[in-house]
């Protein structure tokens, strides 16, 4: 069970990769001088297979006494990934969906997501921004708001991104953004 942010549209949503993450083959990692776990150096492992190692240029500091990593990191540390298939829990009827992925919300990430949404609204009359609870239940109550793009703010994105799912029953939230 977890919270999940996604966008839905009648127009394909382009990928917005996280500029701090890169996937590498074992050989690429070795060429960069990275330490690679021994099991990846075994003869049966294809050294040229893509997407074997996830590399980040950010250093994560983990405090074992803190519930979440401390520090928000750079504003551009987020991604939008088009989804090939909808998850069962998704209530949208729109054909194109994309996952919004960030460790935690920050105003800078909200601002960059707002820019992305504005760009996408050039191709469609309506876009949905969802925050749902993934638990396999298909009967969550839905709270929905319609917001004209000209009125959508970083504060609106913050409100949706930071929804508290600790209340029972879990509620799914959707902003329908219109032109």
Regions found by a protein language model. Name each.
Residues 1-179:
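Structured alpha/beta or helical-core interaction and ligand-binding surfaces enriched in interleaved
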